[in-house]
Swiss-Prot record:
The name this protein goes by in its record: UDP-N-acetylenolpyruvoylglucosamine reductase
Pathway(s) where this gene product acts: Cell wall biogenesis; peptidoglycan biosynthesis
Alphabetical keyword list: Cell cycle, Cell division, Cell shape, Cell wall biogenesis/degradation, Cytoplasm, FAD, Flavoprotein, NADP, Oxidoreductase, Peptidoglycan synthesis
Residue ranges crossing the lipid bilayer per the database entry: none
EC number: 1.3.1.98
Domain FAD-binding PCMH-type span(s) in chain numbering: 33-197
Cofactor dependency: FAD
Gene responsible for this protein: murB
Compartments, record wording: Cytoplasm
Cross-referenced PROSITE patterns: FAD_PCMH
Length: 307
């Protein structure tokens, strides 16, 4: 049963049309899985995020943040408390050699804006399906580039609802890691310092990376992107492939036959299917090679109640 006090309090903080109750989250994830959120809100201003976070902190209400749901699995039991979608914080502004983008802006779009202004440095992101907030959260990268190579600062909100501006060094960006994760912060916007380049050369590089991505990744099915982090000295996909796991299926989810590092939803798969397949792959690779595969994809939410 939804708490009316929380609903009424949220109505005082943000417009009513930005509040959804008992909202199905599978609408907002690339895997097309997930239960319902007690409250799902879509702020369009930084101040609205701050106000809701501050209220939630003062009243001990859990808060979960969502970008575009590309590298996340939400369990069928859903998420209690307040889910804040950051997708409407999607501004992209250019000033000289810098780009400032809102948390909800797609990093693909930001890389395209950089190209349009003949700014080089974000070509690596032309095929990453995440939002800016998610990209900073996990220091997203591809094809030899990553967020930490070009980010200047990130404007964040802490658990108490206060604004914090963090420099590149303060963000502690590492392989798929950052201070954002450790301190439970949320990114509102990020600034990137780029370099002047030639638009034709930037476009050529983006075309090459796009072709490589499309030829190797199973983009025809819903998926959560790259499932595992790269183990030191190895490639997760190669270990999975050498374990003869490509095509292995649990429920409606299977290890992609096109790229072993991906798991695709081929037949109405559930978050439970994903989670079980992830555990099976981890167990098999550990037994065969003695190597632990750590998840890159986030798994959140409550397990479904047994009927």
């Amino acid at each position: 049963m939804i708490n009316k006090d929380i609903y009424q309090a949220l109505q005082q903080l943000i417009p009513n049309e930005k509040i959804k109750v008992d909202e199905p989250l599978k609408r907002y994830t690339y895997t097309k899985t997930g239960g319902n959120a007690d409250f799902y809100i879509t702020p369009t201003k930084n101040e609205e995020v701050q106000a809701v976070v501050k209220y939630a902190y003062q009243n001990e209400i859990p808060v979960t943040y969502l970008g575009n749901g590309s590298n996340i699995i939400i369990r069928e039991g859903g998420i209690r408390g307040i889910v804040i979608s950051l997708l409407s914080l999607d501004h992209i502004d250019v000033s000289d050699d810098a780009i400032i983008a809102g948390s909800g802006a797609a990093i693909i779009d930001v890389s395209r804006v950089a190209r349009d202004y003949a700014l080089t440095g974000l070509e690596f992101a032309c095929g990453i399906p995440g939002s800016i907030g998610g990209a900073v959260y996990m220091n997203a990268g591809a094809y030899g580039g990553e967020v930490k190579d070009c980010i200047d600062y990130a404007l964040c909100v802490n658990e108490q609802g206060s604004l914090i501006k963090l420099t590149t060094k303060e963000l502690e960006l590492d392989y798929r890691n950052s201070i954002i994760q450790k301190e439970h912060l949320v990114v509102l916007e990020a600034a990137f310092t780029l370099a002047p380049g030639k638009m034709t050369e930037i476009q050529a590089k983006m075309d090459d990376l796009t072709e490589r991505r499309e030829s190797k990744q199973p983009l025809e099915y819903p998926s959560c992107g790259s499932v595992f982090q790269r183990p030191p000295g190895h490639f997760a996909g190669k270990l999975i492939q050498d374990s003869n796991l490509q095509g292995h299926r649990i429920g409606g989810v299977e290890v992609s036959t096109k790229h072993a590092g991906f798991m695709v939803n081929v037949d109405n798969g559930t978050a439970t299917d994903y989670e079980n397949l992830i555990h099976y792959v981890q167990k098999t690779v550990k037994e065969k090679f003695g190597i632990e595969l750590n998840r890159e994809v986030r798994i959140i939410g409550e397990h479904p109640k047994e009927s």
